[in-house]
Amino acid sequence: MISSLRGDVIDKGLDYVVIECGGVGYRCLATGDTLATLRRGESAFVLTSLVIRDDAHTLYAFSTSEQRETFGILQKVSGVGARLAMGVMSVLQPADIARAVEEGDIKTLQQAPGVGKRLAERMAVDLKGKFPALEATSGQATIGDIAATGNDTALQSQVVEALVGLGFTEAKAATAVKKILEEQNGTTDPSSVLREALQRLSGQKR
């Protein structure tokens, strides 16, 4: 089991990072919060979780133990796999998830991509009391420090690819991203576009 990595960041995208350890590059999926703490060419340390499936072995990277713990707890709910858990964590902080579960705040949970009313209700019931170690704090890193590209086409493709990876259709993702880029003329921050697209597309699902 690979539980952490320490090495140089040799590549980074909108939803992944590659860390070289001992001459081997490990590709890890991560949320914007974790990616915001990493810089290409610099040394890094991340906590990891290895998810093994029949068709793939996937590493997920986290900058805090709270993030990794939340990732594991979310998957205890029937119907919530690693991809959906990361989708939830891409728009909600661990403390916000814990608070929403304890208070039965279904609407907050529904902000996450792929989480409808029924699943949100199941999460609130099944996970209640499972977050005792998470404090309701707001001092964690926020999305917005990911390296940007100055080309709208490249930015759009990058965000659309991330949305498709989270379960949205390419057509819906492309339409949403295009509209956001038109409204936010001149933006070069893919993470802010991704967050806005997630909120809009999740709202459409509800």
From Swiss-Prot:
GO terms for molecular function: ATP binding; four-way junction DNA binding; four-way junction helicase activity. Residues 151-206 are annotated as: Domain III. The keyword Cytoplasm applies. It comes from the Bacteria. One of its GO terms (cellular component) is Holliday junction helicase complex. One of its GO terms (biological process) is DNA repair. CDD domains: UBA_RuvA_C (cd14332). Residues 143-150 are annotated as: Flexible linker. Residues 64-142 are annotated as: Domain II. It is found in: Cytoplasm. SUPFAM superfamilies: DNA helicase RuvA subunit, C-terminal domain, Nucleic acid-binding proteins, RuvA domain 2-like. Pfam families: HHH_5, RuvA_C, RuvA_N. Residues 1-63 are annotated as: Domain I. Belongs to the RuvA family. Has three domains with a flexible linker between the domains II and III and assumes an 'L' shape. Domain III is highly mobile and contacts RuvB. HAMAP family: DNA_HJ_migration_RuvA. This is Holliday junction branch migration complex subunit RuvA. It comes from Corynebacterium urealyticum (strain ATCC 43042 / DSM 7109). The gene is ruvA.
